[in-house]
Swiss-Prot record:
<keyword id="KW-0658">Purine biosynthesis</keyword>
<dbReference type="Pfam" id="PF02142">
    <property type="entry name" value="MGS"/>
</dbReference>
<keyword id="KW-0808">Transferase</keyword>
<feature type="domain" description="MGS-like">
    <location>
        <begin position="1"/>
        <end position="148"/>
    </location>
</feature>
<protein>
    <recommendedName>
        <fullName>Bifunctional purine biosynthesis protein PurH</fullName>
        <ecNumber>2.1.2.3</ecNumber>
        <ecNumber>3.5.4.10</ecNumber>
    </recommendedName>
</protein>
<dbReference type="GO" id="GO:0005829">
    <property type="term" value="C:cytosol"/>
</dbReference>
<dbReference type="GO" id="GO:0006189">
    <property type="term" value="P:'de novo' IMP biosynthetic process"/>
</dbReference>
<dbReference type="GO" id="GO:0004643">
    <property type="term" value="F:phosphoribosylaminoimidazolecarboxamide formyltransferase activity"/>
</dbReference>
<keyword id="KW-0511">Multifunctional enzyme</keyword>
<keyword id="KW-0378">Hydrolase</keyword>
<comment type="pathway">
    <text>Purine metabolism; IMP biosynthesis via de novo pathway; 5-formamido-1-(5-phospho-D-ribosyl)imidazole-4-carboxamide from 5-amino-1-(5-phospho-D-ribosyl)imidazole-4-carboxamide (10-formyl THF route): step 1/1.</text>
</comment>
<comment type="pathway">
    <text>Purine metabolism; IMP biosynthesis via de novo pathway; IMP from 5-formamido-1-(5-phospho-D-ribosyl)imidazole-4-carboxamide: step 1/1.</text>
</comment>
<dbReference type="Pfam" id="PF01808">
    <property type="entry name" value="AICARFT_IMPCHas"/>
</dbReference>
<dbReference type="InterPro" id="IPR036914">
    <property type="entry name" value="MGS-like_dom_sf"/>
</dbReference>
<comment type="similarity">
    <text>Belongs to the PurH family.</text>
</comment>
<dbReference type="InterPro" id="IPR024051">
    <property type="entry name" value="AICAR_Tfase_dup_dom_sf"/>
</dbReference>
<dbReference type="InterPro" id="IPR016193">
    <property type="entry name" value="Cytidine_deaminase-like"/>
</dbReference>
Length: 532
């Protein structure tokens, strides 16, 4: 079996035309004849590139406003024909072999993302001929190269030069995988979009409204493997890191690594927790995370001050932690970190060249930049359970001063309100049951992941005491309501003066009474932030 087949004829039909003119010129320069359709053929001809319209080749015009272009035996016979097996039938029906197919599909995702997109708009952007050609060419990858990514153009031309106008079987197989990934993702987008819709002419209007939403009846996900890992959460577990395509928001998935060892499974999980927390703050902020829990968070006039204050919360836990900033990492801050502690990962929107030079002295430290961010983009969160997948909206909601309800007799001061909001933002990122003590925009003690809320409160106090931090005058945040007054009593005992929590317990009044007995401020958010 001949493994390499010279490319003599190619069919080009693309929606994304970036780079297609240069690629077509490169093919013609290498003696390849071109077939093309509609807008692609017009663009090539306008640039002086010799091209044959598919309709001229098949003798059958494009019809139905372009719905039928390439669905013809002379096209699919040329793509699917097996060299050395189907030659006679191809000759009998005057079918020329097509050795390369260059196709990308109608922009369905971009169309349905438009606020004014109608169902009719979506339907007209469902590609039929394109996926059919892609699948045909990918199926016959033994003989045909299928190109769906414009980013592959240069590499393909370079390989053709090295292989007498051929591509290796290994390359054609890799291109076929990309093609099936491309069509799978495309069909998934369509299925997800239609799965969210129930038209009123199918059901009663009220039921249709209830059924509509962002959760389709079948969920199709497409992620691309970015990294294979030495192991997973533990050494005996195999693991890999997959990312979504075209993510615009600054994230651990889109971050650029400037130096250091490859990120581990736990590094990525912890870095995500640190970065998402620090993104909550507009002032210069630092978040230090260990095992996906913040162990120190603070604001400052600059990130050096924020780092020093965050580290002060729990230096023991900060050892081997992840540090995230919401401003550029500068030389002074980088120096303070490297001289003070062992750190696994540092992530910031940008890193100054001087800071990068400082961090280079510790070659194993993973240094990442994620770019700047604006407001958070709504997305879905997933949690795998045995045999299923829990799906929910990401918890992006926060409260501001206007949302707070003061239920205690004592009213908070301006500084106390500022600290309460700071503390509440941190509590959102602490594993439940979560209790956070803070003062002057600095965490003082954090109690995480306890089965009872009162023990989280006690642990926050113990942590503060162990580090010699003053709890008296601090505020306290709880990610969920206090079911009993014991958490308030425990907090008052160590000197907490203000409490923020969602409220909503059957015993709310008992909890409020406890706050009043201790002359504490109590503020309700009416929003819970469980984190499991």
């Amino acid at each position: 079996m001949q493994l390499n087949h010279p490319i003599r004829q190619a069919l080009l039909s693309v929606s994304d035309k970036s780079g297609i003119v240069e690629f077509a010129q490169g093919l013609v320069k290498r003696g390849v004849k071109l077939l093309s359709t509609g807008g692609t053929a017009k663009l090539l001809a306008e640039n002086g590139i010799p091209v044959t319209e598919v309709s001229d080749y098949t003798g059958f015009p494009e019809m139905m406003e372009g719905r039928v272009k390439t669905l013809h035996p002379k096209i699919h016979g040329g793509i699917l024909g097996r060299r050395g097996i189907d030659d006679e039938v191809m000759m009998q029906h005057q079918i020329d072999a097509i050795d390369m197919v260059v196709v990308n599909l109608y922009p369905f995702a971009a169309t349905v993302a438009k606020p004014d997109c109608t169902l009719e708009d979506a339907v007209e952007n469902i590609d039929i001929g394109g996926p059919t050609m892609v699948r045909s060419a990918a199926k016959n990858h033994q003989h045909v190269a299928i190109v769906v990514n414009n980013s592959d153009f240069n590499a393909i031309l370079a390989e053709m030069d090295q292989n007498r106008n051929s591509l290796t079987l290994e390359t054609r197989f890799d291109l076929a995988i990309k093609a099936f990934e491309h069509t799978a993702q495309y069909d998934s987008m369509i299925a997800n979009y239609f799965g969210q819709m129930v038209k009123p002419y199918f059901r009663a209007e009220e039921e249709a409204e209830a059924k509509c939403g962002q959760f389709p009846r079948t969920l199709n996900l497409n992620f691309i493997r970015k990294q294979s890992m030495r192991y997973g959460e533990n050494g005996h577990q195999k693991a890999a890191f997959y990312v979504e395509q075209d993510v615009k928001e600054a994230s651990v998935s889109t971050a650029k690594q400037l130096q250091g060892k490859a990120l581990s499974y736990n590094n990525i999980a912890d870095t995500d927790a640190a970065l998402e927390c620090v993104k909550s703050f507009s002032e210069p902020a630092c978040v230090i995370v260990k095992h996906a829990n913040p162990c120190g968070v603070a604001l400052g006039k600059d990130i050096l001050e924020a780092y020093n204050r965050a580290y002060q919360t729990d230096p023991t836990s900060a050892f081997g932690g992840i540090i995230a900033f919401n401003r550029e990492l500068d030389e002074d801050t980088a120096k303070a970190i490297i001289e003070r502690q062992f750190v696994e990962v540092i992530i910031a929107p940008t890193v100054s060249s001087a800071a990068q030079e400082i961090v280079k002295s510790k070659k194993n430290v993973r240094l990442l930049t994620c770019g700047n961010w604006e407001s958070a983009i709504q997305r879905l969160d997933f949690k795998r359970v045995n045999g299923g997948l829990l799906v929910q909206e990401a918890d992006l909601s926060m409260v501001d001063l206007a949302d707070l309800e003061v239920v205690s007799k004592r009213q908070p001061t301006k500084q106390e309100l500022e600290d309460l909001l700071f503390c509440w933002k941190v509590a959102k990122f602490v594993k439940s049951n979560a209790i956070v003590y803070a003062k002057n925009n600095q965490t003082v003690g954090i109690g995480a992941g306890q089965m009872s809320r009162v023990y989280s409160a006690k642990i926050a106090g113990i942590k503060a005491k162990d580090e010699g931090l003053e709890v008296k005058g601090c505020v306290m945040a709880s990610d969920a309501f206090f079911p009993f007054r014991d958490g308030i009593d425990a907090a008052a005992k160590v000197g907490i003066e203000c409490v923020i929590h969602p409220g909503g317990s059957m015993r709310d009044q008992e909890v409020i009474d406890a706050a009043n007995e201790h002359n504490m401020v109590m503020v309700l958010t009416k929003m819970r932030h469980f984190r499991h």
